[in-house]
């Protein structure tokens, strides 16, 4: 995990005699965020079987995907610094937060500032940058000083689910946060260790940067397509995901929304000795509602999430008509509560092209997570 290091400068002599009255000049260092999906999706299912997402993922990832979805498949690195907030509660560890005494954004991994004596709460999160423009993530620091909320706004895409919201929401960028309460910065230097090489007093804090966003890779396998579905419009939606996240606690909000994300169709992909067409996508979410997956290591437990989760998209048939496909992925999302690969399979020999634009209702057979078959209404 990632540690936040608070180091206070001083001399080799008695530290009480060499600190500024009323406070001290301090250095804060935060390690950069680097992870791969193997550590991000650290599930351990029944009988000690670990989650092997690469064995399931057939869509692949090429340069066009990196450009379309805004990043590499199996690597994330935050290089845009951090946002840090600090709250001095005086000598009362239960005092409420006021306007932050420390309010800064750093471009690198460290900064120096002066801390007053007292009991501090510290919050840090990675500075979100979107190369395409303004970030979709919004940060609410004004509703309350007790915690900070991350959220996104609505797009122009209309959706069928989660009234009263009639439009889909933007997916957030990758977001991590760390929160440490009751850091005692005092003149006695209790808990500090002298770093003789650098000649500084160091207070090491067990402060973990944890994800508050979770990635789902979606793939729809089209068997026996033979050109029946010729293209897609590049949009996709997943419903029932949390609209917000609490950066202090790591818990997602209770408000379910539908997220918009991009999708792409690849043709003639070899999979288990068969040539198939695959529609792939990647969506970043705040996870399922009222949940913090970081509190326990993933064990494949279905959390008590009352919301239904659907993936839907429009597909264009070779006769020029389109149809809206809707997949119930509730069981899969609850099973993979920290994100993962969602695979859906369609046998196109069982599906007739719609006779008019806008599609028509029919049943499609889709493979379940446990490899049984069941029907969903389209």
Regions picked out by a protein language model, each given a short descriptive name:
Residues 1-2:
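Sec-dependent signal peptide recognition
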Residues 89-210:
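Short, low-hydrophobicity acidic/polar segments
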């Amino acid at each position: 995990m990632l540690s936040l290091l608070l180091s206070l400068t001083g001399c080799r002599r008695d530290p009480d005699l060499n600190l500024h009255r009323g406070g001290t000049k301090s250095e804060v260092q935060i390690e950069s965020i680097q992870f791969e999906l193997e550590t991000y999706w650290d599930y351990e299912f029944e009988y000690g079987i670990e989650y092997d997402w690469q064995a399931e993922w057939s869509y692949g990832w090429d340069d066009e995907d990196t450009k379309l979805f805004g990043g590499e498949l199996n690597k994330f690195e935050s290089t845009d610094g951090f946002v840090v907030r600090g709250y001095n509660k005086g000598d009362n560890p239960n005092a409420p937060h006021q306007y932050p005494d420390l309010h800064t954004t750093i471009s690198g991994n460290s900064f120096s500032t002066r801390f007053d004596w007292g009991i501090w709460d510290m919050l840090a999160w990675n500075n979100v940058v979107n190369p395409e423009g303004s970030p979709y993530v919004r940060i609410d620091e004004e509703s309350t000083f007790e915690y900070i909320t991350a959220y996104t706004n609505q797009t122009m895409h209309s959706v069928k689910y989660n009234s009263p919201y009639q439009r889909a929401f933007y997916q957030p960028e990758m977001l991590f946060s760390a929160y440490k309460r009751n850091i005692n910065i005092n003149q006695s230097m209790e808990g500090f260790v002298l770093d003789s090489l650098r000649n500084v007093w160091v207070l090491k804090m067990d402060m973990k940067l944890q994800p508050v966003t979770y990635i789902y890779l979606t793939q729809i396998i089209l068997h026996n397509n033979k050109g029946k579905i010729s293209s897609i419009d590049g949009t996709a939606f997943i419903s029932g995901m949390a609209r917000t996240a609490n950066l202090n606690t790591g818990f997602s909000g209770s408000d379910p929304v539908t997220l918009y994300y991009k999708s792409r169709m690849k043709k003639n992909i070899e999979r288990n000795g068969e040539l198939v067409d695959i529609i792939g996508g990647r969506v970043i979410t705040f996870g399922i509602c009222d949940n913090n997956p970081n509190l326990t290591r993933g064990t494949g437990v279905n959390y008590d999430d009352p919301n239904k989760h659907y993936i839907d998209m429009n597909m264009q048939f070779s006769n020029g008509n389109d149809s809206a496909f809707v997949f119930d992925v509730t069981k899969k999302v609850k099973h993979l509560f920290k994100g993962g690969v969602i695979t859906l399979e369609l046998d196109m020999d069982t599906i007739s092209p719609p006779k008019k634009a806008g599609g028509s209702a029919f049943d499609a057979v889709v493979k379940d997570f446990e490899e049984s078959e069941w029907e969903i209404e389209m």
